[in-house]
């Protein structure tokens, strides 16, 4: 099993277990909020499966139909996870508004509160693990899935607050908290979607990246100038094209060696997948 798949498998198993526990306890004690939160957890299994499919497709080597590889697929699937987060925000907000309109009175006990706390703790641990591995491997799917876990933890916080407020006779505080959390989740969803739209559409990296490329190329022996640097995202990785200037008194072999040296130096940089180097002779 590849390292990037482990957190996604953990997501599936964790969400199934948490979802079933919350649904069962919610059904036994007639808690609509716990049942809804449980269904929310089970729905996350779908996004984790989407993530696994995306990672598997993205890891395929280049072929005739995709000569630059399949890394954009990872961003496409991450975008879908962002859309799922938007839907989650909508559902939580809708649930909160309905609670304000209709109200809900149930008998709250320690088991219900304990399940909500368990969900918060487990989901936060899953968030930190997925985020750690995602940043380590620069996997947009894992990073998106991590923030999805965080949204689940926040929705469980809403449930916990709602249960506690209900316990003490305050029936609308939890709904206000739910609306706030829904807006927070929507913001995360927006960031995920925007980031991956940039990756999918081949957006150029920041200006400081181009400065780094020029600096690294000039550090190669006999490179006396650099111009026409172009770079764009191919999925979460970067492809670079540039012209390097060399003196006219060098041999063809030296020109080739310089081209290879610049290419290898640039491709050793973080997130640079490919570098295309053109060697220009200057008098």
UniProtKB/Swiss-Prot annotation:
**Could you say which protein family the record assigns here?**
Belongs to the cation diffusion facilitator (CDF) transporter (TC 2.A.4) family.
Which spans are transmembrane here?
Answer: 8-28, 38-58, 73-93, 100-120, 175-195
What is the protein's name according to its record?
Uncharacterized transporter MJ0449
Q: Which GO terms describe its cellular component?
A: membrane; plasma membrane
Where does it live in the cell? Cell membrane
Question: What membrane topology does this protein have?
Answer: Multi-pass membrane protein
Pfam families (UniProt xref):
Cation_efflux, ZT_dimer
Q: Which organism is it from?
A: Methanocaldococcus jannaschii (strain ATCC 43067 / DSM 2661 / JAL-1 / JCM 10045 / NBRC 100440) (Methanococcus jannaschii)
Q: SUPFAM superfamilies, from UniProt?
A: Cation efflux protein cytoplasmic domain-like, Cation efflux protein transmembrane domain-like
**Which InterPro entries does the record cross-reference, listed alphabetically?**
Cation_efflux, Cation_efflux_CTD, Cation_efflux_CTD_sf, Cation_efflux_TMD_sf, CDF_Transporter
Q: Which keywords, in A-to-Z order, does the entry hold?
A: Cell membrane, Membrane, Transmembrane, Transmembrane helix, Transport
- GO molecular function terms noted in the UniProt entry: monoatomic cation transmembrane transporter activity
Lineage of the organism: Archaea, Methanobacteriati, Methanobacteriota, Methanomada group, Methanococci
């Amino acid at each position: 099993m590849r390292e990037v798949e482990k957190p996604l498998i953990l997501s599936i198993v964790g969400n199934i277990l948490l979802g079933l526990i919350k649904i069962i306890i919610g059904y036994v004690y007639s808690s609509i909020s716990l049942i809804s939160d449980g269904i929310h957890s089970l729905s996350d299994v779908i996004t984790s499966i989407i993530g696994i499919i995306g990672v598997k497709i993205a890891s395929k080597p280049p072929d005739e139909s995709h000569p630059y590889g399949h890394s954009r697929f990872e961003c496409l699937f991450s975008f879908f996870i962002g859309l799922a987060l938007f839907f989650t925000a909508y559902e939580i907000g809708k649930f909160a508004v309905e609670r304000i309109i209709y109200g809900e009175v149930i008998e709250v006990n320690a088991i219900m509160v304990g399940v909500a706390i368990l969900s918060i703790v487990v989901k936060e641990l899953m968030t930190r693990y997925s985020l750690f591995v995602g940043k380590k491997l620069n996997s947009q799917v894992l990073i998106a899935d991590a923030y999805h876990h965080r949204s689940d933890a926040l929705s469980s916080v809403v449930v916990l607050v709602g249960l506690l407020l209900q316990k003490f006779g305050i029936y609308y505080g939890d709904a206000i908290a739910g609306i706030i959390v829904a807006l927070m989740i929507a913001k995360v969803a927006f960031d995920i979607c925007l980031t991956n739209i940039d990756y999918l559409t081949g957006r150029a990296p920041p200006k400081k990246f181009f400065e780094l490329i020029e600096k690294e190329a000039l550090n190669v022996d006999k490179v006396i100038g650099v111009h026409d640097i172009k770079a764009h995202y191919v999925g979460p990785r970067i492809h670079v094209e540039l012209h390097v200037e060399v003196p006219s008194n060098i041999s063809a072999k030296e020109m080739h060696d310089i081209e290879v040296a610049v290419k290898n130096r640039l491709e050793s940089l973080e997130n640079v997948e490919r570098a295309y180097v053109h060697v220009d002779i200057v008098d």
